[in-house]
């Protein structure tokens, strides 16, 4: 399209942008093929949760945390970035570059990272003026804590645009229902239920694999 916009014109950037945005892969339905999508990098998991949940961060501790998962920002081990472009999903012929830094250790580390973010965040760096630390805000889910099904549906909508598999929600609803709640429900119980829902969804591979 850059070389020829269809009318013999080279370098028509408007035509290039139009072709990208209107491409069938961009406009078509959600892809369901098992080999479609990619594993989110550790940094994208962190930034994605902070953005989706209106969080704040001063960056303190995150460099070390994501570094333990194989992706320390600004410290790529080679000129080829953090992983090789031809890396494959272990045991398959499917290209999955991000799996180049994915091991049994970092798989557990991902779940621990999500847990730390959801259940407390990271303290501010006291050497940085006006430091905020890293925190997520779950109030939009806490208000639905007395209706776990509605809460889980809202978490699904916020984290994945409602695209998580239908079978996932009932499982998480059961887990949220298992979090004790009195009548009337207390603020602490609302927070506990919201944390459970967000943690289970964000640590699942339905969230960590972007489609």
Predicted regions located by residue number:
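Flexible, low-complexity segments enriched for small/polar residues
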Residues: 1-211
């Amino acid at each position: 399209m850059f070389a020829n916009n269809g009318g013999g014109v080279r370098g028509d950037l408007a035509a290039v942008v139009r072709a990208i945005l209107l491409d069938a892969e961009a406009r078509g339905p959600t892809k369901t093929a098992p080999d479609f999508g990619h594993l989110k990098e550790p940094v994208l998991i962190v930034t994605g949760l902070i953005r989706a949940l209106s969080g704040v961060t001063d960056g303190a501790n995150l460099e070390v945390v994501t570094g333990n998962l194989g992706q320390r920002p600004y410290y790529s081990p080679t000129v080829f970035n953090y992983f090789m472009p031809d890396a494959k999903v272990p045991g398959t012929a499917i290209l999955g570059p991000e799996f180049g830094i994915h091991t049994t250790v970092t798989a557990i580390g991902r779940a621990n990272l999500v847990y730390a973010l959801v259940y407390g965040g990271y303290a501010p760096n006291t050497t940085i003026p006006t430091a905020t630390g890293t925190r997520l805000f779950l109030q939009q889910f806490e208000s639905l804590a007395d209706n776990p099904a509605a809460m889980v549906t809202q978490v699904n909508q916020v984290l994945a645009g409602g695209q998580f598999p239908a079978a996932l929600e009932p499982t998480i609803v059961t887990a949220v229902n298992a979090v004790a709640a009195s009548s009337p429900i207390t603020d602490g119980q609302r927070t506990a239920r919201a944390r459970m829902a967000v943690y289970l969804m964000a640590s699942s591979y339905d969230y960590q694999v972007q489609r």
